[in-house]
């Protein structure tokens, strides 16, 4: 054939070695067609913008149909192979951009790094991309590379780039749970130093081969790596090889509601018994979100209906989510109560460390609602064990995005919390807010952390009280009866508008209705001495 004589000198980019067609496409290329991966009729062509020659080109009709459905403003549902993946917009849209860039150019200048909370679908998303593109996947974990024999680990890494990748082009290289390779080495013992040195050598080989054999040669290889580690804990050179960094957040309330609704539709059960207590759907969703459970764990619990295994204190990190705070009810001006909340969202960007004194449960709701709704940041509560060390605490935070909010509820006069807050701020850059029952602080606490006192707020009319009550009861998911609200709103107005009396009434009401007890307050966070 005439086109055989063009190979491999065609100025069009060469003869197509592989063309992947859409499963819904009626398009059949003819000899001499210039093939581009436009994401519609042709999912992928290698090399891009190549000439199709039937005798020389491998044609693959992809069997997987990918369908995208927008669930709401912030979430998508991706359907494929009788499966579905529920993803936040901030995950799915960057992934689409990266994959479409790979389709358009036929290569990427680096890889995709999926990092963040475990059990949220990082591995499943990598497999979805493989099915979407219709190309194979080379999967590598630590056991596939690491060896106890001297030099063999480096050889295994070299074999990936020199043999496996060239023999399987185009392909996806999926490096699952890459913490063993990408996390910065920390030295401390002879054994640890030796292991760190070995991994460091393997990392050097990986970085060099990735640059020389893939990026510079512009090979049709899509590298995807996943990790539960924090971004700041990864090696800088490793991160540079993965310019597409996509963060997986802990599950949102919308995610939990979606899978709960599916369960209700499947079983016909719209109430849930947890630890002997019957919960409505709303109560159940709020409870689940508060535990910080992963989507993978939650789906397993729904399948097995083993709700008694759920515990809000199963981990000392617990995400705090408002039950239902509509934007129309709660807005930025609502929490600016006579100077108590005088800061804005910019104050929560790496500079926060302070103490909130007096009426902790009300303060918690005000500040927590403000941060979540206005600043769009998650909040975490610390539920520590008796012997929790700072090192154990920090290791527990690694799966989350750095610089988020830890909210402590302290016992009276315990300034060790202030010291811990200072250490976390200084050593880890974590924003810290903690609460205590009153404003009687040790001098050390005052020096370490500025504090705010909610008892200084002056309520002069029923409307201000109503706004505050709404904020607090919505935050804790309390379903207040109208007569109870009327009593709270009118409380102490005839007695001279005593702020303390009103706040005491509200706090007592919240403690009773939300079943919060003094024993659940954090008392001993860490032994610092």
UniProtKB/Swiss-Prot annotation:
Protein name: Uncharacterized protein ORF529
Transmembrane stretches, start-end: 354-373
Chief subcellular location: host cell
Subcellular location: Host membrane
Keywords linked to the UniProt accession: Host membrane, Membrane, Transmembrane, Transmembrane helix
Membrane topology: Single-pass membrane protein
Family annotation (PANTHER family): AAA DOMAIN-CONTAINING, VACUOLAR PROTEIN SORTING-ASSOCIATED PROTEIN 4A
Organism this protein belongs to: Acidianus two-tailed virus
Gene Ontology molecular-function annotations: ATP binding; ATP hydrolysis activity
GO CC, any one term: host cell membrane
Superkingdom classification of source: Viruses
InterPro entries: AAA+_ATPase, ATPase_AAA_core, MT-severing_AAA_ATPase, P-loop_NTPase
Pfam families assigned: AAA (PF00004)
